[in-house]
Amino acid sequence: MARDFPLERVRNIGIAAHIDAGKTTTTERILFYSGVVHKIGEVHDGAAVTDWMAQERERGITITAAAISTSWQDHRINIIDTPGHVDFTIEVERSMRVLDGVIAVFCAVGGVQPQSETVWRQADRYSVPRMVFVNKMDRTGADFLKVNNQIKDRLKANALPIQLPIGAEGDLTGIIDLVANKAYLYKNDLGTDIQEAPIPSEMDDEAAEWRYKLMESVAENDEELIETFLETGELSEEQLKKGIREGVLKHGLVPVLCGSAFKNKGVQLVLDAVVDYLPAPVDVKPIQGVLPSGKEDVRPSDDNAPFSALAFKVMSDPYGKLTFVRMYSGVLSKGSYVMNSTKDAKERISRLVILKADEREEVDELRAGDLGAVLGLKNTTTGDTLCNTEDPIVLETLFIPEPVISVAVEPKTKGDMEKLSKALTALSEEDPTFRVSTDPETNQTVIAGMGELHLEILVDRMLREFKVEANIGAPQVSYRETIRSSSKGEGKYARQTGGKGQYGHVIIEMEPAEVGKGFEFVNKIVGGAVPKEYIGPASNGMKETCESGVLAGYPLIDVKVTLVDGSFHDVDSSEMAFKIAGSMAFKDGVKKCNPVLLEPMMKVEVESPDDFLGSVIGDLSSRRGQVEGQSVDDGLSKVQAKVPLAEMFGYATQLRSMTQGRGIFSMEFANYEEVPRNVAEAIITKNQGNS
């Protein structure tokens, strides 16, 4: 089957920003103007096409990353609309991993918010080229150039306006295109009657000044263009487009556009800019991976290269399990067998679909650069690589943050027990930041996630989709344990109870691993001191012990274990004996490695009238918070701080009381840090008292 669009004319883009910047409305308008939908859906009406889960339509927020295909100017545009709420950061993370370009949406009034910085960092992590749409220019207090300066100052981006608004707030009547050097005036409310016109005379000087800055910045990134610019003082529209595109692809420029998606102004120009400036799959670096030999390799965006794809999302719906994939190379055909190289398992491709939010179009194949979904995969989860059996490769995977908050959950009736188990399995397959465990002391099921809203939504889904009624406990902080020094550990398990005995013996070296590595295992056995068939069980014994820690029963993270020696018995050794020996060696080693307790630290931003600044800072300090920055603008103070999550329960009520109901705050996970000794001792004592 031939391609609908050449690879050069494909754009895989994401629309990302902080909550309430207008991402979903922008996506809706893109779908309306590109002909995918024929009626405009609003988030606040619960009618947005990309918000298709019941909770999304009720709450007016986007929870999951919805993938949609559309076309514009003979280009295929695959769009992922991502959530802005920090509790759903994994949805943004997995989208960034598979995208080629991003439209970052900012509110013209609110500007750069804490979540904007998080999204920007996620795009930086995967080197995703981006452009900016300053939305809500119709709102009172809208200030395009102020937001542009915030992007430069707070995000350290080379933000470059390629448009200027004509008017603002209630008088937004059009947009100046600095590249084409002309104006677009909006003549109807639907945004479909647009008149090209000369730049209004009262804005001539301002437009000329900003166009000169644009030409100067573009020329600086291109030797050929700088010569032309120095000689003539001018660049043509074609030269500017070429220069901006090259600047975006090299991460040297971020073009900034403006408009109001809600008022139907500026969205078609955003689509034009996606086509003109954001990369095709062939414009970005080939994806890197590791061959079975351990050697690094790359896969180019090419239909003729060996097939490789990354599963970036798994969803259960009434039709079965959907696995979203980003095709990096080759062709994937319906009915074929492929390899899950991450799990070393074979998979059959029963059906392939391209999605338009909650509608789907069946296709016979997916090709390099496509975003699509596979039905019928049995073993594949988020972050797994799919590839040809003849050309195995494991692609770079996703960064998955540790959960920070947990609650106990129990079914209301015995009849709900099995349904709860099925629901939790399905939800944890979909969402890698959602973890399920059993408390060994109380035997309660414990679920952990990225925040209270995250867990609230998941519990809501259990009731709606899986018909499970459950009682939920009070939220608890998800502490972690780690080690600070290196040591050796030894575990010998020998039992003789008549007949065949049990024997396993391992010696390990243990040291702190890089942050984010979790549990890292290295086998350095030589000369068969431990036979190959017992190395896996020994490693599994250690990994399982990791889950319950040694200080207070919390999972142990960022530990590197090297298996260096051991011994075995020809008759008495078994997999179980080596699993137990591995666990014993691990516990022995951890105790000697200065184990410490870690707690989730939250990045908190508080806004309040400046009269309350002293009270806000004093209160944050009393919560073991570290104030990292503060500012006062027009009588409004902003305080940025890092505060332990354990100290933030009940903060909303306290802030309202302190600021007479005029303070607001946002909070997101920052990192795990060591708990101060006196606090750690109290937590450890409490947990040991409960056991």
From Swiss-Prot:
GO terms for biological process: ribosome disassembly. Residues 8-282 form the tr-type G domain. It is found in: Cytoplasm. GTP binds at residues 17-24, 81-85, 135-138. The keyword Oxidoreductase does not apply. GO terms for cellular component: cytoplasm. Keywords: Cytoplasm, Elongation factor, GTP-binding, Nucleotide-binding, Protein biosynthesis. GO terms for molecular function: GTP binding; GTPase activity; translation elongation factor activity. Its main location: cytoplasm. It comes from the Bacteria. It holds the Pfam family GTP_EFTU. Belongs to the TRAFAC class translation factor GTPase superfamily. Classic translation factor GTPase family. EF-G/EF-2 subfamily. Catalyzes the GTP-dependent ribosomal translocation step during translation elongation. During this step, the ribosome changes from the pre-translocational (PRE) to the post-translocational (POST) state as the newly formed A-site-bound peptidyl-tRNA and P-site-bound deacylated tRNA move to the P and E sites, respectively. Catalyzes the coordinated movement of the two tRNA molecules, the mRNA and conformational changes in the ribosome. HAMAP family: EF_G_EF_2_B. This is Elongation factor G. It comes from Prochlorococcus marinus (strain MIT 9312). The gene is fusA.
